[in-house]
Amino acid sequence: MRFSFLSGIRDLFRHFIISAASGALSDRLGWVWGAIAKVFSGSVWLRYKIAKPPHQVQATVVSVGNIVVGGTGKTPLVLWLAQALNERGISCAVLSRGYKGKCSQRKSFTIVDPALHTAACVGDEPLLLAKHLPAGTVRIQKDRKALAEKSAGAFDVLLLDDGFQCNRLHKDVEIVLVNGSDPFGGRAFFPKGRLRDFPERLAKANYVIVNGKCSPSDQRELDLLNPAAKILVEPQISEIVWLNKSANMPRDHWEGLGVGVFCGLGFPKGFLTMLRNAGIHVLGTHLLPDHSGITKQELELFCKKIILRQGVGILCTEKDSVKIEAFAEEMSLPIGEVRMRFSCVCNEERMVAMLDAIEAIQKNKKVTT
C-alpha cells in the first residue's frame, strides 16, 4: 500500500512539473527548477543508498532503460528485442508500469489486449507493443517485482520496459539508451535538465545504445564511463501508414512531402530530425508533453492550419496514433502513422552479440533452475 501511494504521488508531481516546465512558466521559474532538481537528485541518491538486495526470479530479466526523462527510443528497441528473441525460439513477455494507464492502478496485473483496451486504460506504449507482439505477452502493473514473479514461470525472458531505475528486481542484462544529441540530459537533473539518474551509473550497463549522432566530446565521455558496451544506431522510417486511408505511402513519395507533425514525446527533436532527414517538409508542429494525447478538436484545428500552408497530411508516431484511432478517419487531412526502425551505424556485430549473450544466459538459467 505504501509503495503504491508513494508512486502515485511521485507520478502526479512529475506530470505537473513536466507540463509546467514545457510551458510559458519555464523561463521565469529557473531558480525553482534548480532547487527542485537538487531535491530530486538527492532522492535518487538516497534511493540507491537504502535499496534492499534485488529479488531474483526464475526467468531471465532484461532491462531496457535510460538516464533521462523520456525520449530515447526505448519502445522501438523493446519491440525489436522481443521480435528478435522470438525468432530464436525464445518466449518473451514485456513488463511495463503502464504509465498514465488506469489499469496500472489495479492490484493484479493486466494482460494488454488491443481488441479490448485503449491507451487511456493501459498506456500508449504497452498498447503499441501489444499490437505487434503475440497475444498475452505485454503485461502491466505498477509493482514490477510482483509482475515479474507472476510472469516468470510462463516465459523464458522478461523484458523490463524502463527498468534501469527498478532496484527491487534482479536484472541479468542492463541495456541503456541515450540520445546522441544530448546523452547527458542537459547535464542537470530534472526539471532543470532532463536527467533522472546519475550519468556515472552508465558504467553498470551491459550495453549502452547511442541513438543518433554524437559529438566527439560526448563520445569520449561515454567511452570513459563504459568503454566496452557502446552500440551506435540511427532511427529511420520503415514505413508511413495512412490511418484514414488504410494504405501505406511508397518510400519514393516521401521526398518533398509537405505535412504537419504532432507528437507527445519526451524528446520530439529526434523525431522531427528523422522526418527532415528523409526529405519530408515539416510545415508546422503541435508538440505535447510526453505520453499526452491530442483531442479531436485540437487535431482538426491543426489540420486546418496545415491546409492553409498547402500541406497534404499530418504525421505522428505510433505511440500517438493509438490515442486517436477513434476519430482519425473524421479529420479533414489524412493522418499518417510513422513506423520506425533502428539501423546500426557501426558495431552491428555487438547487436548480434547482445542477442547471443541474452540467449546464453537464458539457456544457462533454464538448466540451473
UniProtKB/Swiss-Prot annotation:
Enzyme nomenclature, EC number: 2.7.1.130
Q: Which GO terms describe its biological process?
A: lipid A biosynthetic process; lipopolysaccharide core region biosynthetic process
The protein's GO terms of the molecular function aspect are: ATP binding; tetraacyldisaccharide 4'-kinase activity
Give the source's domain of life in one word.
Bacteria
Q: What class of enzyme is it?
A: transferase
Q: Tell me the SUPFAM superfamilies matching this sequence.
A: P-loop containing nucleoside triphosphate hydrolases
Family annotation (InterPro entries):
LpxK, P-loop_NTPase
* Keywords, ordered alphabetically: ATP-binding, Kinase, Lipid A biosynthesis, Lipid biosynthesis, Lipid metabolism, Nucleotide-binding, Transferase
CC per GO annotation: plasma membrane
Asked if the record carries the keyword Transmembrane, the reply is no
**Residues annotated for ATP binding in this entry:** V68, V69, G70, G71, T72, G73, K74, T75
- Protein family: Belongs to the LpxK family.
- Name the chain's protein: Tetraacyldisaccharide 4'-kinase
Give the species: Chlamydia muridarum (strain MoPn / Nigg)
